[in-house]
């Protein structure tokens, strides 16, 4: 199962997308916003998304495990599992991770990570008055949103 990007994400980032090396950059920014919002999720129909890749691309490849760890920590907290409950933590990890897949995420894990990215996009569009016009101003405001 691939990483998926909401179709409206491309339009919203259109003025700064030239500054991105990969389309995955947009996905990652939305994911971080969703994680910062406590794992905020949105359900989006597959027809309203585009397929990106099924593995962490480019420079994200070496950071994939860290990204997954942030996702797992957020999910464990979101569902209210105590970090001291090793059995419940391990079950959550088993449900979301599959080391045999290119992304290292299970189908459920990928679906949930995509939903967090969609929710992060919602959070960004709510926080910004208008779509970003320059990368510099976007990053200043983005940093305020995620901290």
Predicted features, each with a name:
Residues 1-32:
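N-terminal leader/targeting peptides and immediately adjacent processing regions
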Residues 21-49:
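Short, basic amphipathic alpha-helical segments that act as recognition/interaction helices
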